[in-house]
Swiss-Prot record:
GO CC terms in record: extracellular space; secretory granule
Disulfide bonds: C20-C25, C41-C85, C44-C58, C52-C75, C59-C65, C92-C105, C99-C117, C106-C111
Functional description taken from the UniProt entry: Isotocin causes contraction of smooth muscles.
Protein's name in the database: Isotocin-neurophysin IT 2
Organism from which the protein derives: Oncorhynchus keta
Keyword Disulfide bond annotated: yes
Keyword Nucleus: no
Superkingdom assignment: Eukaryota
Location(s), subcellular: Secreted
Glycine amide sites (modified residues): G28
């Protein structure tokens, strides 16, 4: 074989195999990340009452959710830690989406309103129905308004 053919074969083999390189290998090799115990995601928000759901999302059961605000700045550090974290709450969609706050379902990309996240709150909380539903209704209305706002306003 010629040198060019050997080079092409080598480059093809290199692109097909899945290797981790020195700059992005986890400690212990690429398979060690699967064996590592999952840890809770970092706490965030006022009084550290919330948990990070993504680099700019902080949610807590009693405090609601923040997205892209100063309360979420601490969550950026999660990107630099070598082991993955597991957020609390029960699944409310796919494997990566979890109940973050009463009526709110989040993953690392964003949040949405989800009625199934109220069931967890009702079972855990013994306060009156009207007291718990008022804050949940406000959250749902805010999420609803955020989903339906136009991308820009046309001034007349």
């Amino acid at each position: 074989m010629t040198g060019a053919a050997v080079s092409v074969c080598l480059l093809y083999a290199l692109s097909v195999c899945s290797a981790c390189y020195i700059s992005n290998c986890p400690i212990g090799g690429k398979r060690s990340i699967m064996d590592a115990p999952q840890r809770k995601c970092m706490s965030c928000g006022p009084g550290e009452q919330g948990r990070c759901f993504g680099p700019s999302i902080c949610c807590g059961k009693d405090v609601g959710c923040w997205m892209g605000s100063p309360e979420t700045a601490h969550c950026m550090e999660e990107n630099y830690l070598p082991t993955p974290c597991q957020v609390g709450g029960r699944p409310c969609g796919s494997d990566t989406v979890r109940c973050a706050s009463p009526g709110v379902c989040c993953d690392s990309e964003g949040c949405s309103a989800d009625q199934s996240c109220f069931a967890e709150e009702e079972g855990d909380n013994q306060i009156g129905q009207s007291e718990g539903s008022n804050s949940a209704d406000v959250i749902l209305r805010l999420l609803h308004l955020a989903d339906h706002t136009p991308p820009h306003r046309v001034h007349q």
